[in-house]
């Protein structure tokens, strides 16, 4: 698996590799009890879940790394758990409204000893007193709704990183028709291609005014 990541300039340390393998094992086992993912093949897991989660942070030019992240609708831990594993210096808040999935995230947190992770079992719009540098979301809801949820949680000039499929332009067009556009400084798209013809991805970066 290391060769896949090396091609993108990403180095997996032995410790990180072990934790990623352990994460995969936990996910596959718990997936038998609750619906976490349809992806069970190990190569697909590493490409469509792990690589997909971290690529925006390695392939976006002039990116200033955040000190804190809030992940909306973390589900099975993508991208939240993955970002916490790759960047242990960043504090990561995982929000998940479904109890069974939140308990899964707690299990992963404790098993992998992720001291930089906090799991909150609630809807993101109900969470109070949490301000972060970056809000992320992957396969949760439309862009306009995500921005509406994210803005109150961001520090001044904080950013949003929303993982989308290649056909995201209509969502951006709809977002620009709303009043929320007046609250953001800029929108940038980072496009990347997953190996083994596993798809095109777009990360929508949005900066708060």
Task: List the predicted regions and their residue ranges.
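Conserved SAM/SAH cofactor-binding pocket of Class I
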Residues: 54-137, 147
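Active-site capping/gating segments
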Residues: 167-209
């Amino acid at each position: 698996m290391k060769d896949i990541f090396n091609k993108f300039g990403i180095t997996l340390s032995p410790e990180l590799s072990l934790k990623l393998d352990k994460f995969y094992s936990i996910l596959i086992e718990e997936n038998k009890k609750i619906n976490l993912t349809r992806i069970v093949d190990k190569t697909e897991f590493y490409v469509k879940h792990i690589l997909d989660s971290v690529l925006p942070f390695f392939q976006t030019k002039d990116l200033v790394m955040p000190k804190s992240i809030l992940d909306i609708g973390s589900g099975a831990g993508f991208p939240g758990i993955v970002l916490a594993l790759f960047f242990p210096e960043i504090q990561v808040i995982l929000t998940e409204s479904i109890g069974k999935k939140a308990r899964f995230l707690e299990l992963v947190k404790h098993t992998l000893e992720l001291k930089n992770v906090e799991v909150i079992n609630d809807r993101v719009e109900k969470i109070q007193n949490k301000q972060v540098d970056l809000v992320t979301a992957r396969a949760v809801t439309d862009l306009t709704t995500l921005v509406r949820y994210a803005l109150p949680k961001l520090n001044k000039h904080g950013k949003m990183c929303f993982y989308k499929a290649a056909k995201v332009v209509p969502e951006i067009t709809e977002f620009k028709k709303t009043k929320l556009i007046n609250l953001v400084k800029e929108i940038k798209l980072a496009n990347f291609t997953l190996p083994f013809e596993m798809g095109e991805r777009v990360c929508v970066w949005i900066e708060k005014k």
